[in-house]
Swiss-Prot record:
Protein name: Probable mannosyltransferase MNT3
UniProt function note: Transfers an alpha-D-mannosyl residue from GDP-mannose into lipid-linked oligosaccharide, forming an alpha-(1->2)-D-mannosyl-D-mannose linkage.
Cytoplasmic side: 1-4
Claim: Membrane is one of the keywords in the record: yes
The keyword Glycoprotein is assigned to this record: yes
Entry's family note: Belongs to the glycosyltransferase 15 family.
Membrane topology: Single-pass type II membrane protein
Residues bearing carbohydrate: 73, 149
Keywords assigned by UniProt, alphabetized: Glycoprotein, Glycosyltransferase, Membrane, Signal-anchor, Transferase, Transmembrane, Transmembrane helix
Chief location bin: membrane
Phylogenetic lineage: Eukaryota, Fungi, Dikarya, Ascomycota, Saccharomycotina
Compartments where located: Membrane
Length: 378
């Protein structure tokens, strides 16, 4: 009887004080990061403590207080591997020196596997302030969709060995991800604009204005630096399917001439998407989603080698207007093997550029920029 009374008393105490007890235990527990967890730190010792407390298998951010917050809701976006860490560090330092030390924008890093301790620690250490997002790509966004015959796709890849990344499985996953899923990632969709960067790229000029603020003030939705022709072998059926989609949906666009030649057929031109500064709304809408689903169901990402650059470019030509597009001509941008270097000597000196203007790709026979500008400005 006595024990019965004791149990009743304990039950009453637990019901009465359970919120306080739960709070007490929480104060002694290191929680695994949730989808929105953001760790704040001010010293490297605190950063190490944060990293050593968890395996970080999901999406989270690390934040060091910034004196001057960014003016717009934008992020620098990079898809990379743990093994890329040293080229990532070089690129970040370059971007900080040339641009972001002045504007303090967030970085968002995405990977198809969890970022490891070394990557997170080194990257967080080199960025002096602001928020750094580390995200894991959902497996369904980095794998074969159910309608793809994997054996057939594997066999077909061998026929593409003579074109860049032609026999790569991961490259195809990447192109599909950047075509239809990156803007849906929970760490990306919180922003309005993104600037896509890649490991190893270089910025050769000081950027003395806020590129995101410029895009917003001037109502620009898509910005590019370099354009070029796609390898026709990688997209043999893409344009036929696009024409079918245009006809089926009765699409009229003033930008279609960007992608057609004098014979009114596909000219293979595209914006080089390893650099793009864009409004995420150009992808987060029914028009783009329907277009992507149409292409994805055709299987061309795996049965051919459709790239995200032609997909983005075709969508821009279908759904945007001339006034929405901006060419960043004075960035001084390099991604192997092409360079965009300012030709105006006064701007070159003013922005402390260090690239060789004679190696500029913009006006070469392999560039589409002259054609693009003629369409955009007429």
């Amino acid at each position: 009887m006595l024990w019965h009374l004791v149990f009743i008393l304990i039950a009453i105490l637990l019901l009465t004080f359970s919120p306080k007890i739960e709070s007490l235990f929480k104060s002694f527990t290191i929680n695994k990061p949730t989808k929105t967890t953001c760790y704040q730190y001010t010293t490297r010792e605190q950063l190490k403590s944060i990293l050593e407390s968890d395996t970080h298998e999901t999406n989270f951010c690390i934040e060091k207080p910034s004196i001057s917050p960014p003016k717009t809701n934008s992020t620098l976006l990079m898809l990379c591997r743990n093994s890329d860490v040293f080229s990532v560090l070089e690129t970040i330092q370059n971007i900080q020196d040339r641009f972001n030390d002045k504007y303090n924008y967030d970085y968002t890093f995405l990977n198809d596997v969890p970022f490891n301790y070394e990557f997170i620690y080194l990257v967080s250490s080199i960025i002096p302030h602001g928020k750094i997002n580390f995200g894991l790509i959902p497996i369904e966004h980095w794998s074969y969709p159910s309608h793809i015959n994997i054996s057939l796709a594997t066999e077909i890849r061998q026929n593409y060995a003579n074109v860049p990344y032609g026999d790569s499985e991961s490259y195809r996953h990447m192109c599909r991800f950047y075509s239809g899923f990156f803007y849906k990632h929970e760490l990306v969709k919180q922003y309005q604009y993104y600037w896509r960067i890649e490991p190893g790229i270089k910025i050769y000029c000081d950027i003395d204005y806020d590129v995101f603020e410029y895009m917003i003030i001037n109502d620009k939705k898509y910005g590019f630096v370099i354009s070029l022709f796609e390898y026709s072998e990688t997209i043999p059926t893409l344009w036929n399917h696009v024409v079918q989609y245009i006809n089926d949906n009765e699409i009229k666009s003033e930008l279609l001439p960007l992608l057609t030649n004098k014979y009114n057929w596909y000219n293979l031109c595209h914006f080089w998407s390893n650099f793009e500064i864009a409004n995420l709304d150009i992808f987060n809408n029914d028009d783009y989603e329907n277009f992507f689903q149409y292409l994805d169901n055709l299987g061309g990402f795996y049965y051919e080698r459709w790239g995200d650059a032609p997909i983005h470019s075709i969508a821009i030509a279908l759904f945007l207007q001339k006034k929405d597009i901006h060419w960043f001509e004075n960035i001084g941008y390099y991604h192997v093997p092409y360079l965009q270097c300012p030709q105006d000597i006064d701007l070159y000196v003013k922005n402390k550029c260090t690239c060789n203007p004679d190696e500029d790709f913009t006006w070469s026979d392999l560039s589409c920029t002259n054609h693009f500008l003629n369409i955009l400005h007429n």
